[in-house]
């Protein structure tokens, strides 16, 4: 029999709370979904942090709360964290999370790309939070920047932190 490793990204940084009532938007919802995924068989939990309004964030306090609570309940799970952060974060902000938490795994993006989801909320009748519309529409004029210099910095930071890369390739 083949062995399979299941990795679960509980939430990414693209979708917003208004897109689904089932979306794990708050830190506690993210924690619960991660624990549920682990109990269902996920060995790797890929984590993005969000604040109480469901907005993607990269602050250490929110990330620390989420990571520590998942690890308490799932001590055997491999926890990987995003270096994609949230749209609008600087390269330094995105990678500082590795140096601070020294996670087992973290995403290593293999290149830059045009990453637009500006029409995501067009068919949503009621947007729950003020931040959502601007968050998605600004991607129309946005590049998800991962230059060779950024990638090298990311890998060096991971090596120094003992973090394994989870390579993410978006465009082939």
Residue ranges and their predicted role:
Residues 88, 95-172:
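Conserved anion-binding
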Residues 18, 43-66:
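Glycine-rich, proline-tolerant flexible connector loops at the mouths of alpha/beta enzymes
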Residues 30, 37, 48, 106:
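Conserved, mostly hydrophobic/aromatic
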Residues 3-9, 44-46, 76-80, 103-107, ...:
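Structural preference for beta-strand elements that scaffold enzyme active sites
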Residues 8, 56-81, 154-160:
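Alpha-helix-loop-beta-strand connector modules within alpha/beta enzyme cores
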Residues 1-22, 124-131:
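N-terminal small/glycine-rich loop or linker at the start of catalytic domains
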Residues 10-32, 82-91, 140-145, 166:
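Active-site mouth loops of central-metabolism enzymes
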Residues 9-13, 50-52, 82-86, 109-113, ...:
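Active-site beta-loop-alpha junctions enriched in small/polar residues
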């Amino acid at each position: 029999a083949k062995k399979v490793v299941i990795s679960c990204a509980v939430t990414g940084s693209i979708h917003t709370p208004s897109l689904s009532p089932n979306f794990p938007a708050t830190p506690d919802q993210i924690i619960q979904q991660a624990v549920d995924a682990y109990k269902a068989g996920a060995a790797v939990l890929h984590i993005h942090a969000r604040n109480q309004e469901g907005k993607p964030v990269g602050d250490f306090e929110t990330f620390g709360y989420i990571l520590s609570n998942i690890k308490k309940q799932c001590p055997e799970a491999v926890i990987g964290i995003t270096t994609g952060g949230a749209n609008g974060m600087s390269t330094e902000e995105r990678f500082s999370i590795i140096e601070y938490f020294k996670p087992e795994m973290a995403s290593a993006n293999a290149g830059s790309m045009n990453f637009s989801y500006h029409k995501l909320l067009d068919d949503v009748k009621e947007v729950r939070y003020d931040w959502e519309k601007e968050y998605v529409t600004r991607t129309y004029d946005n590049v998800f920047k991962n230059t060779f210099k950024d990638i090298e910095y990311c890998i060096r930071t991971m090596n120094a932190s003992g973090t394994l890369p989870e390579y993410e390739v978006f465009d082939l």
